[in-house]
Amino acid sequence: MKIFLTLILLSSSTLTFADGNNDWQNIDDNIFKLNSLNSCQGCLLRNANFIGADLNNALLSGADFISANLSNSNLYNANLEGSSLFGAEINGSNLENANLFGSNLFAVNLYGSNLAGANLTEADLSHANLSGVNLAKANLTNANLRGADLDGAILDGAFLCNTMMPWGVDNSSCQ
């Protein structure tokens, strides 16, 4: 009887977090909004699954993608300025010409992704997996790559000014 009552109570309840917010519903609504409008600025999208998603030219500034999976996604020319992608999986994705100005990419997995021409000014890429990543002509001014894995990364023509690299500050592109 006790198990039956517990099941009834759980089936009629809604999952909420400690602050009382119904974040699971918000995430579903935000995914619908993103799919409909290709825009979801400041949206909560934590732990969401966007594997293989086409988010070409999407407006996602300030979005919360913490621990989301964006592997093999197309984010060409997407605006992710000020977004939080802490711990996200973005391996094998296309972020060519994406705007990631001031974004939090701490401990993100970008293995094999294309960030050619991306704006990573003031981005936090510390402890990120950037192995095999194409960063050609990317702007890394004031970016933090301390502790990042750059094994096999392509940095041809990348703009490095006051860039905190794993080996220290790189000012090779400053004028």
Per-range role (PLM):
Residues I8-L10:
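Cleavable N-terminal signal peptides of Sec/SRP-targeted secreted and luminal proteins
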Residues D19-Q175:
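Tandem repeat scaffolds
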Residues M1-L5:
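Positively charged n-region of N-terminal signal peptides that target proteins for export
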